Amino acid sequence: MPQLPLIEPNTALFLDFDGTLADLAPRPELVQIEPELVGTLRTLYQRLDGALAVISGRPILELDHFLQPLQLPAAGIHGAEFRTDGGMVSKTHAPGLEPLIPHLEALVRAYPALRLERKSVAVAIHYRQAPELAGIVDAAVTDVLRHAVGLEALPGKMVVEIKPAGVDKGDAIAAFMKTAPFAERVPLFAGDDMTDEPGFAAVRKLGGLGVLVGQRETVAAVSVPGPAALRSWLHRSAHALASSASAGAPRAVPHEAGPGRGRRPTTS
């Protein structure tokens, strides 16, 4: 694959969270954020005139918790949640989800190594602590979705999610690219999981660049070895943009909230 260039001033930057900005952890709530990351994202937001968004499988409130005090434009739950700069979070409703929860809770009771994670309009079953249970999880999800309406399964790294049908990270990126300040820019999306492939396809269709974090088959054009390499590239790009002779004073200021505004992630 070709070498990843530094971020240009005309970039619309889209970043996955887990496995991209942050290293993966045994459980979602145990993820740690590198101390310098928030400052780097703030600088990038300013130098890109606000054209930076986080595109994640997590709920947006959890992203706010990890990245506080920043409240960046974001798409959560693979596009089922959406927030423009400083705006309210809009959600794709999933009324068929609640009847499935008792069946999934019974599965977790039967296999205690599994983790059930509620995500407002989605639910995830994690099997990172017991990879041998992948087939059992897949079969259980297929069974509970048999008569569900408006929901679909989304496999990921040691996880299967049930989310609203017809939304994905590619749709979220395409929606951002139709609005200011993202419109008319060159999109770049970095992600690590199979759930990020629609995002890679979307930026390629729009003439942009997909960046895979890790190594596997992908439609992304460029790859980096892991989250540490991705963060290093972000730091170097932020420094280069801020140091540019033509940079001038930043014109965009990210929306920020006081401590504790983001929801602390939990699993059930």
Task: Identify the residue ranges that each predicted region occupies.
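Substrate-recognition/cap helix-loop segment adjacent to the acidic, metal-dependent catalytic center
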Residues: 58-75, 133-152
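Substrate-recognition "cap/lid" segment bordering the active-site pocket of phosphatases
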Residues: 77, 83-103, 154-184
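Charged, glycine-interspersed solvent-exposed loop segments at helix/strand-loop junctions
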Residues: 114-132, 151-163
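Short amphipathic alpha-helices and their capping/turn segments at secondary-structure boundaries
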Residues: 1-9, 61-67
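Mg2+-dependent phosphoryl-transfer enzymes with acidic/Ser/Thr/Gly-rich catalytic loops
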Residues: 8, 34, 165, 170-268
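Active-site phosphate-binding/coordination module
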Residues: 32-119
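Asp-based phosphoryl-transfer active-site loop
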Residues: 6-26, 54
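Proline-centered loop/turn at the N-terminus of a beta-strand
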Residues: 12, 51-53, 73, 152, ...
